[in-house]
Amino acid sequence: MNHLIAFWPILKRLLIYVKPHKKKLILAFIFLLSGSTSEVLGPILISYFINNILSKHQLHLLIILTIITLFIILQILSVFLNYFQSILFNKIAVESINKLRQDVMYAALQQPISEFDSQPIGQMISKVTNDTEAVKELYDTVGPTLFRSIILIFIILFAMFTLEWHMALVALFILPLVITIMLVYQYYSTPLLRKVRYYLAEINNKFNETINGMNVIQQFCQQRRFQEKIKKSSDLHYMSRMKILRLDGFLLRPLLSLLSSMILCNFMFLFSFFPVGAFEVGVLYAFITYLGRLNEPLIAITIQQSVLQQSIVAGERIFSLIDSPKQKYGKNKDLLKSGKINIQNVSFYHKNCNKNILENINIKISSKSFVAFVGHTGSGKSTLANLIMGYYPLKNGKIYLDDKSIDSISHSVLRRNVLMVQQDPIVLSDTFFYNITLGRKIPEEKVWNILDTVHLSDLVKSMPKGIYSLLGEEGNNLSVGQKQLLAIARVLVAYPKVLILDEATANIDSGTEQLIQKTLLSIRKNCTLIIIAHRLSTIIEADSIIVLKKGKIVEFGTHEQLLTKKSCYYKMYKFQSCKF
């Protein structure tokens, strides 16, 4: 039974989202109960008509018209009540799933950066989109259908016991068999449904990977190989789906129809034990009608069992994201004043990797100084910058900002005072103004001043709508250098105390590099500046250059001091000088 999920705890958590809509839910249930009752009363009227009017040949027109009118009113009432309950349940479902989706999205936004390093993005997207849509079925389809079916079963059984309790006992025999079928279905369907949800997320992940890497795929003619990768996941999803369908086809409708036929045969067998005339024709008609009606909610319940299992499995995946550990930040909300950094005995390794990426790092960076981290690929430069940003929790050692442990500083203070410009900046499909402010309440005049600082004001003025001009998807109407300048402008409007540039000039032309150099010269007076350098020519004026090799500090000093040592930095600088 280990492969079964904790059904009731997950269902209970999902139903909590319906709790704020209690009044609507009660009204919907009243409509549902009234509609089901109206639906069941019809055969009783017909039974009365057969027994008391038709069989006795007392065809009074007024009585017949009254029965017909009542029957039509009951059917119309049933239709309207079922319509209104359906509208209410759908409204509750949409509002509940909207809240659930917001919670899932919030949980995704609160995930530690390390989770995005190890978890496929497609899996997370699937939890926010596909899985929440599967849970929606619980609110707008499964819940109302199950409740309506259960109400119908009880009302039909009550009516059957009222008419003839011997025959009703025979009909009651079907219920334990149905419960057995549902338990067997749950046992075999749960692991299959898990696979279905997983493979669907895998398809999303591989498709996302393919779209993002389309340039490389087409450049190296790898379309067929990536098509095969998606096809493999799609085939696995298809096979798991087919197993579910075969299980549905065997355990649900056909088996229930067979059970109903067996009950009908039992009725016929039961008749042989009663004397002729013991049953009225109207009662017999009502029982046969109710048996057919009883079959419908039972089939509906077993069919919804499949949808319910999908919703529960989707809920399990959603809550695995919501309940996943969040990165812990401190509670100190005092703003940083100087931007002084002190790194003491820091060693670090990523999750699922026992080898240290950084080992025994000790650095002191004074306020408003210009420091550069250099080293070959894999030396630990970006990891060290990410630790200063507070992206990863420290395992060994301490980092102090303004003599306060980074673990004690609140998330809002950390994000406001320590900012980073990455090598591949993110540009949103929105206006230039929004891309800089990101929704923060920043005056337009201040934004223009920052644009002047980063030498982008002329570009923005040349655009049709100026600062409110729309940028294309991922900033496709901007050059790489312009994106970098925009990213620098984005962080400068916040006046950070510590600014980190992670190889921000690695992929740009020399002209844009000079603009960025001018920008850095103008802002270094206001904040502590840390640059992860690819081009060593950009850090010649740094107050201190720290050379990393295999996660260790091997050299530090000014540009001139390191050249004098003629060691690692000297070799790197000479190599680049000869290269250019």
From Swiss-Prot:
It is an enzyme of class 7 (translocase). InterPro entries: AAA+_ATPase (IPR003593), ABC1_TM_dom (IPR011527), ABC1_TM_sf (IPR036640), ABC_transporter-like_ATP-bd (IPR003439), ABC_transporter-like_CS (IPR017871), P-loop_NTPase (IPR027417), Type_1_exporter (IPR039421). GO terms for cellular component: plasma membrane. Pfam families: ABC_membrane, ABC_tran. It is a multi-pass membrane protein. Residues 25-310 form the ABC transmembrane type-1 domain. It catalyses: ATP + H2O + xenobioticSide 1 = ADP + phosphate + xenobioticSide 2. Its EC number is 7.6.2.2. It is found in: Cell membrane. The chain crosses the membrane at residues 26-46, 61-81, 150-170, 173-193, 247-267, 268-288. Gene3D superfamilies: ABC transporter type 1, transmembrane domain (1.20.1560.10), P-loop containing nucleotide triphosphate hydrolases (3.40.50.300). ATP binds at G375, H376, T377, G378, S379, G380, K381, S382. GO terms for molecular function: ABC-type oligopeptide transporter activity; ABC-type xenobiotic transporter activity; ATP binding; ATP hydrolysis activity. Keywords: ATP-binding, Cell membrane, Membrane, Nucleotide-binding, Translocase, Transmembrane, Transmembrane helix, Transport. Residues 341-575 form the ABC transporter domain. Belongs to the ABC transporter superfamily. Drug exporter-2 (TC 3.A.1.117) family. This is Multidrug resistance-like ATP-binding protein MdlB. It comes from Buchnera aphidicola subsp. Acyrthosiphon pisum (strain APS) (Acyrthosiphon pisum symbiotic bacterium).
